[in-house]
Amino acid sequence: MIYVYNTLSREKEVFKPITAGKINMYVCGPTVYNYIHIGNARSAIAFDTVRRYFEYRGYEVNYVSNFTDVDDKIINRAQEEGISELEVANKYADAFDEDTLPLNIKPATVRSRATEVIPEIIEFVKDLIDKGYAYESEGDVYFRAKKFKGYGILAHQDLAEMEANAAGRLNDEETIRKEDPIDFAVWKNEPREGVISWSSPWGNGRPGWHIECSVMAQKYLSNTIDIHGGGIDLAFPHHTNEIAQSEARTGQKFVNYWMHNGFVNVNNEKMSKSLGNFTTLHDMLATYDDPMVIRYLLTTTQYRRPINYEASTLEQARLELERIRTAYRNLMFRAETSEPGGDEDVETLIEVQKKAFDQAMDDDFNTPNALAAIFELVSIGNTYTERNTVKVDTVQHLLGTIADLLSVFGIEGLDGNEELTTKQRELLDKRVLARESHDFERSDLLRNQLKEVGIFVEDTPQGQRWHK
């Protein structure tokens, strides 16, 4: 059984999909007004890993995520850059795709944009008004939060406290327009010329942020979905408001399992622009040459826990991943000289660690414990390759198991060929030829040239091995 921590109940619950063997999963994507930061990247990687594990366990996952491509932040950025809101959204949506591609994040089944579902949003708002859950006020439409029973339960927020906090954030105009301080906008009036808007029964305007995700989840999945994911900062108000408006409209439970990933801290401090430690994925990729290390780092902590990012943790992640890659290459190397058959003692050890991996991931996707099982496999492989004789079935079993388990983490290309530059490959090939022709002076020269480009070689009775 797979156990999932449900933010709504604050407990780990046995996962039971609505439809056997299938999972409907919605994950909040970014507001595309800037390059995504490392916290956004963590969320994308965390839920990609969850998705991959479900697929590894045989589930068919319908994975929907969004771009919020109409928002105050996008409007402000468009005015700053002197381009249209659509151009801003397209620029940073494309940047998201380009920056997440090297991290090996699987494409969503559907990647929807808010601007693609405006007619559905308007119909949704109409239904809320008809049911008495929303009201129009000077071109804005607000949701009556207190009318929805259980409002705030996801974030375990006290209604009186929410009301006091909301009142402190309102300006005079909002105070006049709202019936209650905690009411939230599902449609916003937009009277300004040249600012993106759509015609509606309440005048020109645009959707509120929260309603966009409700509409996309219902359109591309169903009224009730298995899993809704996002950063913990979205639990209130975003996901709280999604629940209220979705269930008010349909009368059905919106989400069975709410999953939230923790924050990324930078040098043990909360990431923020005011502290000057705001780190975008775009900048990281421009300065760090191995995206898989970034991905690996962001899976070393269980998804609900905060994770610390700094130069030392990135270097530790690089060393750990290189340890795995080196062991994998050594196994591939020994496979070339292996004998037929298998070694039962090692086969048993492999299955023990595979079971340990599954048990860890079944426990609310406990990636640190799952990685521990992978490193046990690495140790088993390292010990095995030191034997004088190895068996092909066992070597292939080790290779296949390590690759399968790491693919759940999105870590692929373990043979290292994809990591090598053309120059590095050429130097390695030339050195093999030099050794075969007993040209040891040239072999040593090539060893030094390889060292200069970051490749270290060692000679063994079975031939040349290399690592970074």
Swiss-Prot record:
One of its GO terms (biological process) is cysteinyl-tRNA aminoacylation. Zn(2+) binds at C28, C213, H238, E242. It is an enzyme of class 6 (ligase). Gene3D superfamilies: Cysteine-tRNA ligase, C-terminal anti-codon recognition domain, HUPs. It comes from the Bacteria. It is found in: Cytoplasm. A motif ('HIGH' region) lies at residues 30-40. Keywords: Aminoacyl-tRNA synthetase, ATP-binding, Cytoplasm, Ligase, Metal-binding, Nucleotide-binding, Protein biosynthesis, Zinc. It catalyses: tRNA(Cys) + L-cysteine + ATP = L-cysteinyl-tRNA(Cys) + AMP + diphosphate. Binds 1 zinc ion per subunit. ATP binds at K273. Its EC number is 6.1.1.16. CDD domains: CysRS_core (cd00672). Belongs to the class-I aminoacyl-tRNA synthetase family. PANTHER family: CYSTEINE--TRNA LIGASE, CYTOPLASMIC, CYSTEINYL-TRNA SYNTHETASE. Monomer. This is Cysteine--tRNA ligase. The gene is cysS.
